UniProtKB/Swiss-Prot annotation:
It comes from Mycoplasma capricolum subsp. capricolum (strain California kid / ATCC 27343 / NCTC 10154). GO terms for biological process: trans-translation. Keywords: Cytoplasm, RNA-binding. This is SsrA-binding protein. It is found in: Cytoplasm. The keyword DNA damage does not apply. GO terms for cellular component: cytosol.
Amino acid sequence: MSEHLIVKNKKAYFNYEIIQTYQAGIVLNGPEIKSIRNHDVSINEAFVLIRKKEIYILNMNVKKYQFANYIKGLEETRTRKLLLHKKEIIKILNKIKQENLTIIPIKLYFKNDYVKLEIALAKGKKLHDKRQTIKKRDTERKELRDYK
């Protein structure tokens, strides 16, 4: 099982406290796959919604593949369906309702030639939590420098 990282949402770990992660497949078209292989994709502005017990990713930007003839209506930031088991979707839905959590995309990667998206149940950090994270990171860097 080889995993090849395509893109990572770096701001997710800074803006959110990650509670649990899930691996989901994505419904894509042929030209979108080729564009993703060229790393012409961004998940920084993307978010995940659950509608009628189906899960979707919105605002994931997949640039148009330059050598493909495009179908009308195929937008770069269109809504794409995520593939998860019904039990997982229901479990996620229950946790969101109980604990006031959000679903965010963490990373996009290839696993055995299939594009997978790692999504996470997360809780938003407050401003003082972000400051604590920055201070903690700075002290760790300083200790490493002093250690060397």
